[in-house]
Amino acid sequence: MLTSHVDQIKGVKLKSSHSLYSDFFNFSHQSSAYFLFQQGVECYEGRKGGRVHYAPQKTPLGTVNLVFIDPLCQGADLPELLSEFDASQCVPNLYVCVSSRVAKPLRQRGYAINQIGAESKITLANFHVHGKKKKQLRHASHFGERNNCTVKELPWSEVDEAQVKDVSLAWLRSKGVNNRELRYATRPPVYGDEWQVRKFYCFHEGKVIAYVFFDPYFEDGKILGYCANILRARPEKACNGALDYTILEALKVFQDEGVPELSLGVAPFSNIQSDPDERPAIRVFSQFFYDYGSYFYACKGLAYHKSRYRPIETPWYLCSKDIGLVRLYWALLFGLKVAGGREI
């Protein structure tokens, strides 16, 4: 069963300027656009409008600007906005996890273009769990019946904060990220209500055992889809399947509302293909990290989980210019918090 409290969640008071939210409603076509709402993010505003959100990252070889989402702007204004932004900065700009929409004009500006991973999307109108290839999802869809669990969409005031945080701590400790919350290429969970974010919780005997937070993205003032950004579940064997069950129950709600698509996010370094304008060393390192970097991030496991939904995969890109490899990877690994000290 699933209970919805959409009206309460959508009534959260806005905390930022009207113009930013207006741009977000019109130009946040990329599923990761909501990642701009986190600490350490700066904004460049173009002369004709449009915004480039970025995070300066210090390295021993100098600062690097991490541009981690597509700019918010009209498509026709994008090349000029990127040119303005590059000219305004005195340090290199490193575009991370941007779409082909951004990679194309950067290619024309002399940037090296490397695939960084594949985003997975589901068209909700025709999604189902029938057939041999979705056997695991079909099994997960009955998790609630087998284990007496329910999924509810709730405002924060109706959730036990301690239970939710306990799920996060248990989940993080079971992963190979040394208790770090990654940022920019994703965003850490916010324990509270957030503007337009949908939060679904899986309960067993009144206790939270899993939850999924869905970030919205828009185009021309209309909801384009939701991104399953934060997925957490207790690591006990009895909870296996709770995350997929939560996603599938939320998916039913989105289908009933007529939401066009659901993004499962990007699988870092997955299905990387060569590019005529790439830096070959970056592709080699990316493949090596995908194959052997599970201590830092479980790339293979994440890619496999997404593949079970039989999604449409689209490459995202890393675009670099005038930056050495050591400086580049230092900015990436420490800026995104793939590497670094413990936090929790």
Provide a role label for each language-model segment.
Residues 90-94:
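Short active-site oxyanion
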Residues 65-76:
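Glycine-rich phosphate-binding "P-loop"
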Residues 286-296:
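A short acidic, glycine-rich active-site loop
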Residues 118-121, 142:
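Glycine- and small hydrophobic-enriched segments that form the cores of compact globular domains
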Residues 81-82:
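Inter-domain linker/hinge segments that demarcate the starts of reverse transcriptase
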Residues 6-67, 96-114, 125-139, 146-282, ...:
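A conserved beta-strand-loop-helix scaffold within acyl/acetyltransferase catalytic domains
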